[in-house]
Amino acid sequence: MAKTSAVEKNKRRRTTVANQAAKRAALKAIIMNQALPIEERFKASIKLASLPRDGSKTRIRNRCEVSGRPRAYYRKLRMSRIALRELGNLGKVPGIVKSSW
C-alpha cells in the first residue's frame, strides 16, 4: 500500500487541475497567439506562472485505485499489475481469466 498522504495529495492535485483547466487553457491560447502584441502575451505568461503549480496536468501521477501503487499501472483498468492479478484470480474483474493451454 502506498502512503495515504501521497494518494491524498494526488487526489488534491486532480481537483486543482480540474478547477484550473479552463483558465490555463485560455492563458496558453493567448500566449501562443502570434497575432497579439508581445506585451499582452508576456502579461498572460506572467499570469500563467502565478497560478498554482499543482494545477498543471503533468503534476498528476497515475496511481492504482485499489492499492495506490504508482508503478506498473494499467490505464485502461486504472489499477496496478499486482491488484489486477489478485482481483483477476478472484474473478472480480470482468473479462479477465487465467490463461491455460
Curated annotation (Swiss-Prot):
Subunit structure: Part of the 30S ribosomal subunit. Contacts proteins S3 and S10.
Protein name: Small ribosomal subunit protein uS14
Family according to the record: Belongs to the universal ribosomal protein uS14 family.
Keyword terms: Ribonucleoprotein, Ribosomal protein, RNA-binding, rRNA-binding
Function: Binds 16S rRNA, required for the assembly of 30S particles and may also be responsible for determining the conformation of the 16S rRNA at the A site.
One GO process term, biological-process aspect: translation
A family per Pfam: Ribosomal_S14
A Gene Ontology term for the protein's cellular component: cytoplasm
SUPFAM superfamilies linked: Glucocorticoid receptor-like (DNA-binding domain)
Organism of this sequence: Rhizobium leguminosarum bv. trifolii (strain WSM2304)
Record InterPro entries: Ribosomal_uS14, Ribosomal_uS14_bac/plastid, Ribosomal_uS14_CS
Molecular function (Gene Ontology), one example: rRNA binding
HAMAP family assigned: Ribosomal_uS14_1
